[in-house]
Design a protein with these regions (language model features):
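C-terminal motif of bacterial Sec signal peptides marking the signal peptidase cleavage site
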Residues: 13-16
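Sec/Tat-exported extracytoplasmic proteins
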Residues: 49-57, 76-84, 113, 131, ...
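Aromatic- and glycine-rich peptidoglycan recognition patches
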Residues: 18-40, 44, 82, 91, ...
Length: 163
Protein backbone atom coordinates (compact mmCIF):
# COMPACT_ATOMS: atom_id res chain seq x y z
CA UNK A 1 0.00 0.00 0.00
CA UNK A 2 2.98 2.36 0.35
CA UNK A 3 3.36 2.42 -3.44
CA UNK A 4 0.20 4.50 -3.90
CA UNK A 5 1.48 7.49 -1.85
CA UNK A 6 4.89 7.20 -3.51
CA UNK A 7 3.32 7.17 -6.97
CA UNK A 8 1.19 10.16 -6.04
CA UNK A 9 4.27 12.09 -4.88
CA UNK A 10 6.09 11.18 -8.08
CA UNK A 11 3.16 12.34 -10.20
CA UNK A 12 2.87 15.64 -8.36
CA UNK A 13 6.60 16.23 -8.13
CA UNK A 14 7.25 16.52 -11.83
CA UNK A 15 3.89 17.67 -13.12
CA UNK A 16 5.27 21.17 -13.56
CA UNK A 17 7.71 20.06 -16.21
CA UNK A 18 5.15 17.93 -17.98
CA UNK A 19 2.81 20.71 -18.91
CA UNK A 20 5.10 22.62 -21.24
CA UNK A 21 3.35 23.15 -24.54
CA UNK A 22 4.57 20.91 -27.31
CA UNK A 23 6.19 23.05 -29.95
CA UNK A 24 7.53 21.77 -33.21
CA UNK A 25 11.25 21.23 -33.10
CA UNK A 26 13.32 23.84 -34.92
CA UNK A 27 14.25 22.73 -38.44
CA UNK A 28 17.83 22.04 -37.34
CA UNK A 29 16.77 19.84 -34.42
CA UNK A 30 15.95 16.62 -36.21
CA UNK A 31 17.03 13.19 -35.09
CA UNK A 32 20.57 13.20 -33.73
CA UNK A 33 22.93 10.69 -35.31
CA UNK A 34 23.55 7.62 -33.15
CA UNK A 35 27.25 8.23 -32.57
CA UNK A 36 28.92 8.23 -29.17
CA UNK A 37 29.48 11.65 -27.68
CA UNK A 38 33.05 12.80 -27.41
CA UNK A 39 34.05 12.67 -23.74
CA UNK A 40 35.02 16.33 -23.99
CA UNK A 41 31.54 17.32 -25.21
CA UNK A 42 29.86 15.40 -22.38
CA UNK A 43 32.18 16.89 -19.77
CA UNK A 44 31.54 20.40 -21.07
CA UNK A 45 27.77 19.81 -21.04
CA UNK A 46 27.92 18.51 -17.46
CA UNK A 47 30.02 21.50 -16.38
CA UNK A 48 27.67 24.02 -17.98
CA UNK A 49 24.61 22.31 -16.47
CA UNK A 50 26.24 22.37 -13.02
CA UNK A 51 26.84 26.12 -13.37
CA UNK A 52 23.11 26.62 -14.02
CA UNK A 53 22.08 25.13 -10.65
CA UNK A 54 19.94 27.71 -8.88
CA UNK A 55 18.44 29.17 -12.07
CA UNK A 56 14.68 29.59 -11.57
CA UNK A 57 12.13 27.19 -13.02
CA UNK A 58 10.02 28.70 -15.78
CA UNK A 59 7.28 26.82 -17.61
CA UNK A 60 8.44 26.57 -21.23
CA UNK A 61 11.72 28.30 -20.31
CA UNK A 62 14.84 27.76 -22.35
CA UNK A 63 17.21 30.49 -21.18
CA UNK A 64 19.09 31.49 -18.01
CA UNK A 65 16.05 33.63 -17.15
CA UNK A 66 14.33 30.32 -16.36
CA UNK A 67 14.21 26.71 -17.55
CA UNK A 68 11.86 23.79 -17.70
CA UNK A 69 13.44 20.33 -17.83
CA UNK A 70 13.82 19.94 -21.59
CA UNK A 71 14.64 23.62 -22.06
CA UNK A 72 17.63 23.21 -19.75
CA UNK A 73 18.99 20.28 -21.78
CA UNK A 74 18.21 22.03 -25.07
CA UNK A 75 20.02 25.20 -23.92
CA UNK A 76 23.13 23.41 -22.62
CA UNK A 77 23.69 21.51 -25.85
CA UNK A 78 22.79 24.50 -28.04
CA UNK A 79 25.49 26.50 -26.23
CA UNK A 80 27.94 23.76 -27.23
CA UNK A 81 26.83 23.84 -30.88
CA UNK A 82 24.68 20.72 -30.78
CA UNK A 83 21.07 20.81 -31.93
CA UNK A 84 18.54 18.79 -29.94
CA UNK A 85 14.75 18.68 -30.12
CA UNK A 86 12.96 20.87 -27.59
CA UNK A 87 10.73 18.39 -25.70
CA UNK A 88 11.77 15.60 -23.32
CA UNK A 89 9.98 12.96 -25.40
CA UNK A 90 11.66 14.10 -28.62
CA UNK A 91 15.04 14.28 -26.87
CA UNK A 92 14.56 10.72 -25.65
CA UNK A 93 13.86 9.59 -29.21
CA UNK A 94 16.89 11.47 -30.57
CA UNK A 95 19.69 9.97 -28.46
CA UNK A 96 21.46 6.62 -28.49
CA UNK A 97 20.27 4.50 -25.54
CA UNK A 98 22.86 3.92 -22.82
CA UNK A 99 22.47 1.44 -19.92
CA UNK A 100 22.38 3.05 -16.47
CA UNK A 101 25.69 1.46 -15.49
CA UNK A 102 27.40 3.03 -18.53
CA UNK A 103 26.24 6.62 -18.05
CA UNK A 104 28.90 9.29 -18.56
CA UNK A 105 28.82 13.02 -17.81
CA UNK A 106 26.72 14.78 -20.41
CA UNK A 107 24.37 11.84 -21.00
CA UNK A 108 20.66 12.51 -20.69
CA UNK A 109 18.51 10.68 -18.13
CA UNK A 110 14.78 10.26 -18.70
CA UNK A 111 11.85 9.63 -16.41
CA UNK A 112 8.12 8.93 -16.76
CA UNK A 113 6.60 10.44 -13.64
CA UNK A 114 3.84 10.26 -15.06
CA UNK A 115 4.88 12.66 -17.82
CA UNK A 116 8.16 12.86 -19.64
CA UNK A 117 11.03 14.41 -17.69
CA UNK A 118 14.72 14.80 -18.54
CA UNK A 119 17.92 15.71 -16.73
CA UNK A 120 21.60 15.87 -17.58
CA UNK A 121 23.91 13.35 -15.90
CA UNK A 122 26.98 14.95 -14.27
CA UNK A 123 28.62 11.84 -12.78
CA UNK A 124 28.70 9.96 -9.48
CA UNK A 125 24.99 9.09 -9.68
CA UNK A 126 24.04 12.79 -9.85
CA UNK A 127 22.14 14.71 -12.49
CA UNK A 128 21.01 18.30 -12.97
CA UNK A 129 17.39 19.03 -13.81
CA UNK A 130 14.64 21.65 -13.60
CA UNK A 131 12.00 19.82 -11.55
CA UNK A 132 9.00 22.13 -11.21
CA UNK A 133 7.62 25.53 -10.48
CA UNK A 134 8.71 26.90 -7.12
CA UNK A 135 12.08 25.18 -7.35
CA UNK A 136 14.99 26.06 -9.54
CA UNK A 137 17.51 24.00 -11.42
CA UNK A 138 19.03 21.55 -8.96
CA UNK A 139 21.23 18.50 -8.53
CA UNK A 140 19.56 15.22 -7.65
CA UNK A 141 20.66 11.63 -7.07
CA UNK A 142 19.80 9.12 -9.74
CA UNK A 143 19.80 6.38 -7.11
CA UNK A 144 17.22 8.14 -4.90
CA UNK A 145 14.06 6.01 -4.56
CA UNK A 146 11.96 8.83 -6.05
CA UNK A 147 13.90 8.70 -9.32
CA UNK A 148 14.50 4.95 -9.40
CA UNK A 149 10.74 4.47 -9.55
CA UNK A 150 10.26 6.55 -12.69
CA UNK A 151 13.57 5.95 -14.47
CA UNK A 152 12.98 5.41 -18.19
CA UNK A 153 16.56 5.21 -19.44
CA UNK A 154 19.65 7.11 -20.41
CA UNK A 155 20.88 8.37 -23.74
CA UNK A 156 24.03 9.75 -25.30
CA UNK A 157 24.09 12.83 -27.49
CA UNK A 158 26.09 12.54 -30.70
CA UNK A 159 29.22 14.67 -30.85
CA UNK A 160 28.75 15.33 -34.56
CA UNK A 161 25.22 16.67 -34.29
CA UNK A 162 24.81 20.35 -34.83
CA UNK A 163 22.36 23.12 -35.47
Amino acid sequence: MRTVPVLLLVALGLAGCAGAPRRPAPPSAGRVAALPAAPVLGARAAELAAHLVGTPYRFGGESPAGFDCSGLVWYVYRELGVGLPRTAAAQHAAVRPVPADELEPGDLVFFYMPEDHVGLYVGDQEFVHAPKSGRGVERARLDAPYFILGYAGGGRVAAGAGP
